[in-house]
Amino acid sequence: MKKHIRTFLAVMLAMTMFNACSSNENFDENGKIANAFEQRRNLVGGNYFDIFGELDGLRLQAMQFMYAYMPLPDIADYPAEYHLQNVDYALKARAEMPWGKTVPVREFLHFVVPVRVNNENMDTSRAVFYNELKERVRNLSMHDAVLEINHWCHEKVTYTPSDIRTSSPLATVRTAYGRCGEESTFTVAALRAMGIPARQVYTPRWAHTDNNHAWVEAWVDGEWHFLGACEPEPVLDLAWFNAPASRGMLMHTNVFGGYDGPEEVLSVTPCYTEINVTANYAPVVTTNVKIVDKDGNPVKATVEFKIYNYAEFYSAATKESNENGETSITCGHGDMIVWASKDGKFGFTKFTAGKDCDVTVVLDKEPGYTATLEMNITPPKERNTIPAVTAEQAGENARRYACEDSIRNAYVATFPTDAYATELAAELGLDNATVATLFKQSRGNYATMVDFLRACPADAKEKAMRLLFCISEKDRRDVSLDVLNDHIVAALESDNNTDWFYNFVVNPRVSNEMITPYRSFFKSVILADDVMKYKANPELWVEWCRNNIKVADTWNPLSLCMSPKGVWEMRVADTHSRDIFFVSAARAMGIPARVDEVTNKTQYLCDGMWVDVNFEALESNNAPQGKVKASFVPSAFIDNPKYYSHFSISKIVDGRLQLLNYPEDATWESLLKDGSALDTGDYFMMTGTRMADGGVLAHLTFFTVEEGKENRLQYVLRESNERLQVIGDFNSENLFYDTTEQRERSLLSATGRGYYIIALVAPGSEPTNHFLRDVMPYKDEFEKWEQKMVLLFRDTNEAERFVNDFPELPSTVVWGTDINDNIYNEIVANMKLKNPNRPIILVADTFNRVVFMSQGYSIGLGEQLVKVIKQLSE
């Protein structure tokens, strides 16, 4: 925070000018903001509000607006001077940008002033972005400025998947890539920095495929328009997800504060208003829902609207029914599950939006409920609308796209090379391969790694490396030097080299929080005698937390992670931050502790056993457990179903589903073949087969786990002989060498979004010749389909030996070579192939789903493929 405090006085001087220009404006004509602020100040107390005595005018009103609705972690972890600097830059943009005064007060307060976009770690990006972008967009229209800012964003960042913690905008820039949630957070931050109202829109889960997505909406001259973050197009309302979004069941955004815009309100919290924007992308319809008990009496209950995705019923929206048991949802035209619960009882049903106008849910399921059910789920159909783009616009955008790639790649080229890693490893006496991996993963944060390792004593460098690989890969991209220096002390002060010591004492990461240098802080505020007492009996530390930390989930509805130091100082936190605080302080005292990744239970290690922490009871006790096993008969393509792809298990707690978060590589074999221990209680296992059209054949099993007993289930994976179904997965981000363009590129970049055909072929082989000749008669059909057919040889030698005697192949063919057999090896592993025979042909899509596979000699492949693509087009 030192950087923004140093600039504070300079900003104050600048504000003197443009506050005068804004003297006629009033952000709080009816006094609503001032009243909300006073209520919040009385609730929180402390010295967090001292700065307000120095403020007046629009600065005061904007700061009151922020603090009236700000989640607790943002009050506790960021000084008031930080929030004031961001307010000042918002007012500066409003005064200096040509569109500034055209933005209504409502849109300015809710979509420009707040620096927080989602759950990211906040930083000083607003000032940085404003100063970098102001001259670039000053003379543009608001419309063109939005497009230009997205081009600038693409110069800085491109897509790559990563974990759930959202990097700050500046960390994303330093890394030069991010997942969609980070790209959209970054782009919204850039737009808001320039005084353009912007919001992050997301579909929590697609209905037609196992994934989700986030993008950006910008307010331009009175209307909201969408764009793909860091994916510039020649016009607004155009992105690769136009078609998928038209199949969306629900798309929404969280708006800071008490927003009263025209959109449907899904929920209102003390900090934000959740609104429904699905109608911006897909045809929608409203379904009315009534919740009743077994006698038909209306019930005021919790109502969750769920979408099948990642083999679970995911809650896309949660509402409360009124005194008459009524609520409603506006969503796309497809199947959704409505799940209601009250006092441990629950009920659910599937409804088809657009067909079922009124739905009744009966709360007739009670603890101990067991059953097996089948359910067919149908997503919305595609209704794609694409805005017009001229050939000139597309060509210019492609030219700029390539230029922006080169700018970003030039920056990435400054990251350490393997040669530098070898040199540094020799200097520090460390393993060369490990240092090279560290540099590749730390990317733009590599200098922090170098400074940290060089500063460590020679006999402690291996300990330093262990710390660096305890934290997550994303941590290595944005962790600060003071954090590393703070936490290495635990390793330096101990001779313990066990994995549990490094993972659960030295490791600063507990859950999904931004890691901070809390260890030295706790050593300074917790008395040494108390540390000895807590280490001897960790239940005393549980008791201290129970008695001293007030839980207030209401004021942190997004479950942002308050820093452990912030929790100690405020003595108020949400449940999740309280749990992280407990573990962090315990580790600082040398007590092994964790938040279990599967069950989310807070635990400490005692006599080699993990003890469940119970902050409500007087003493912590481990829950009794039983065992669950499931038998499974392998299918032709699936012999070991994957968790999240083919099945999931949730515990039913107070009538609601709580997913067990097993590792991403968990399977039936690792969890259920020989059985897993589960806490006693009620459970729900979902298995599902995703069809090529996005539909799902689901099987639902409700079961109980009793103490000391084994429950044996039947794992049922439904199949269809009539419809194409998803039979495997294949990464569309895989690289190949394009022999026409003579460069490496991803399959996704070559094929574009949607389905495509990929074939691994062998020059001169009879099966490959048959395949290519079978394709030629259907040249017109493949070209009408317009999707790519990627034909890959094993290497350059094979490509050079190939004699192209197949003149009538479709023009959509892309020729290339595999790189180090990477694509071949993945297909063999994922599709369970028993031999290396080529050709190997897949029909897959860029959501990584495989719906057709053929290997080796086969006659009539051209006709088979045409039948497949026709089904995909229906």
Q: What is the meaning of each model-derived region?
A:
Residues 24-27, 135-136, 140, 145-151, ...:
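Hydrophobic/aromatic-rich core segments of domains that either
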Residues 25, 31-175, 211, 395, ...:
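Secondary-structure boundary elements
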Residues 746-775, 788-792:
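Short active-site neighborhood of thiol/selenol oxidoreductases, capturing the structured segment around
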Residues 713-749, 770, 817-818, 867:
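N-terminal "domain-start" segment that seeds a small globular fold
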Residues 837-856:
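A short, hydrophobic beta-strand/beta-hairpin element that forms part of a small beta-sheet core
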Residues 804-838:
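Short, internal strand/loop/helix patches
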Residues 221, 322-338, 342-345, 351-357, ...:
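Short Pro-Gly-centered beta-turn/loop motif in secreted/extracellular proteins
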Residues 267-280, 352-389, 621, 698-731:
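Extracellular beta-sheet/turn segments enriched in Thr/Pro/Gly and aliphatic residues
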